[in-house]
Amino acid sequence: MSNVWFTSDLHIGHAKVAEDRDWAGPDHDLHLAELWDEQVGKEDVVWILGDISSGGTRAQLDALGWLLNRPGRKRLILGNHDRPHPMYRDAPRLSRLYWNVLDYMSTAARLRVPLDGGGHTNVLLSHFPYVGDHTAEQRFTQWRLRDEGLILLHGHTHSRIIRSTMTNPRQIHVGLDAWHDLVPMDEVREMVNDIEEGL
């Protein structure tokens, strides 16, 4: 049986982000590889909600090599540091390299999450939250999904806060800066059920 995992903002090879992540220790990328390899099985699905690297061509190639060596089926929701994102003119050129590693790549996706009382609800996946950023300015607004009431799993903010009732209680941050780990579907399902129950 396969499991489903979520994460965001890996930033493989990104020295500034690694420095800010004191929890990851001196070898950030090795620490993330160990976390991944200990939990993810060959048939598991890992949704990466953007920013595999710092965005330069060499950094992207290194991050793709890092991902290629990790178990599981990787699905990438493109972020602002991922060059295949349509915000970049050279997106088609680098997309081919990404497809060698990924089995899905898009700017957004929708998943069904089971509800405790039966049935399911739809959640959206995007790198960008409905609202929030790690700067004072709300950047990349033209690439953000419009909030029409669906729960949103996101990254981008580099916040340690998983769910904020002050910004939008229907968005869940699955980034490494909040979790320090991959997020299993069971955790997401629990939070989604809490939101649907008004908690």
Swiss-Prot record:
The gene is 66. Gene3D superfamilies: 3.60.21.10. Transmembrane segments: none annotated. It comes from the Viruses. This is Gene 66 protein. It comes from Mycobacterium phage D29. InterPro entries: Calcineurin-like_PHP_ApaH, Metallo-depent_PP-like. One of its GO terms (molecular function) is cyclic-nucleotide phosphodiesterase activity.
